[in-house]
């Protein structure tokens, strides 16, 4: 049955940034598809809630408090999956971020942090996960959560967009190096109804602008992204690697314009 190709029974998945929003949705979705899920994030109470939700649905999960910018935490997250459950099949690099900031007031420190959070940490997580996937499960799948900010002209997102664009290219390059045993793909996420979009969704004027600029007429949901992540994590995508899957409501231009001061001659 073709639906069986989307099942993850007997597999073990690690999801970073799993305490809230998209990461939480992905963790729950993978568990519903049969995976044992190891969830990592910085806030223990958030992780406990995710684990409780998974267990209430009949799934199995383990919480590991993790800051993906800390080497010891990254290693503990991967090691916990292998030590507790004997294998590793899936890694979802969801942790990432940094807010909007106009280019002319973006500091070197801010830019460096955007790169570390959005591409360096996912690279190091992937590096740690690949060999255990091969050794314990014969291979696996890495799913990187990227953003449409990576391939659109979007004011105030120079640091974040650069980090996600680098993540996209890293995905392609790792896919070539890790094939055929470990697949590596990414999801280019549009505007999703999470805490980060709350300022837009709670303002009638901004929400109307967002929906008018989105062909599907609504923001995404964490479940929308979880469905895509399940496809890329599961045997259903066994002939797919090195690809960026856009899940964005059909947007080909920014759903929101962030006003920034234009450059002027110095007086």
Where would I find each of the regions flagged by the language model?
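Active-site helix of classical SDR
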Residues: 126, 163, 171
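Short, small/polar-rich loop/turn modules that mediate ligand/substrate recognition or access, typified
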Residues: 92, 179-183, 240-242
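Alpha-helical segment proximal to the catalytic Tyr-Lys
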Residues: 131, 175-180, 238
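Short C-terminal tail/terminal secondary-structure segment
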Residues: 1-4, 152, 241-267
């Amino acid at each position: 049955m073709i639906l069986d190709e989307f099942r993850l029974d007997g597999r073990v998945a690690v999801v970073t940034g799993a305490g809230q929003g998209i990461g939480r949705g992905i963790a729950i979705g993978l568990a519903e598809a049969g995976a044992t899920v190891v969830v990592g994030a910085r806030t223990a109470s958030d992780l406990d809630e995710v684990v409780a939700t998974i267990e209430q649905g009949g799934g199995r999960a383990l919480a590991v408090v993790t800051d993906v910018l800390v080497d010891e935490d990254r290693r503990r997250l991967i090691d916990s999956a292998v030590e507790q459950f004997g294998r590793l099949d899936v890694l979802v690099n969801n942790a990432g971020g940094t807010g909007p900031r106009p280019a002319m007031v973006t500091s070197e420190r801010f830019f460096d942090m955007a790169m570390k959070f959005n591409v360096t940490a996912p690279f190091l997580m992937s590096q740690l996960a690949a060999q255990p996937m091969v050794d314990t499960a014969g291979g696996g799948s890495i799913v990187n959560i990227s953003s449409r900010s990576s391939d659109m002209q979007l004011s105030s997102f120079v640091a974040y967009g650069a980090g996600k664009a680098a993540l996209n290219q890293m995905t392609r390059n790792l896919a070539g190096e890790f094939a055929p045993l470990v697949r590596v793909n990414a999801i280019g996420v549009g505007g999703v109804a999470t805490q980060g979009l709350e300022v837009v969704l709670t303002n009638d004027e901004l929400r109307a602008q967002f929906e008018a600029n989105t062909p599907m007429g609504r923001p995404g949901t964490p479940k929308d992204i979880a469905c895509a992540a399940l496809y890329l994590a599961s045997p259903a995508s066994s002939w797919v690697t090195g690809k960026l899957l856009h899940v964005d409501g059909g947007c080909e231009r920014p759903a929101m314009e962030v006003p920034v001061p234009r450059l002027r001659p110095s007086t």
